[in-house]
Design a protein with these regions (language model features):
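Acidic/histidine-rich catalytic neighborhood of metal-dependent amide-processing enzymes
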Residues: 1-52
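Active-site-adjacent substrate-binding region
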Residues: 35-134
Length: 134
């Protein structure tokens, strides 16, 4: 939503959410590249955090190494003000600045398998929140 340009997109989304009284079950940000999964950061109640932590074995096939408190991402941060649980998907960041904001930051550089694993983690989180709740 553009944290690189002052976060105006995230703030506008938050203002629209409040204005229209939109309900969010959760917000998830993925803003560190399309690399293989490493972990999930979560900002919510301790009870919800423990529930997500209990799902770790279900995320093991995607190579998720940790689920930690804190570190959701700048674009969704405003939503915390209205009680929305926030999550950040954290991929392996070793190659991030090899591509990010460079001429090489193109879709053909993405490793298909890494992107599939990352999508699997995000899709699984959505499914688990939907079926098991917070």
């Amino acid at each position: 939503m553009n944290e690189e340009n002052g976060g105006a997109g995230g703030k506008a989304y938050f203002e629209d959410t409040k204005k229209n009284n939109l309900k969010h079950i959760a917000a998830l940000e993925s803003d560190a590249g399309g690399f293989s999964p490493r972990g999930i950061a979560i900002d919510t109640t301790m009870g919800a955090y423990k529930k997500v932590l209990s799902w770790k074995p279900l995320l093991d096939p995607y190579f998720v190494q940790y689920i930690k408190i804190g570190g959701h991402g700048a674009d969704i941060g405003y939503l915390a003000d209205i009680g929305v649980p926030l999550m950040g998907f954290e991929p392996d960041g070793q190659k991030y600045f090899d591509y990010h904001h460079t001429a090489d930051d193109t879709f053909d550089k993405i490793n298909k398998r890494e992107l599939e694993l990352s999508a699997g983690v995000i899709g699984s989180l959505i499914y688990l929140i939907d079926t098991k709740g917070w």
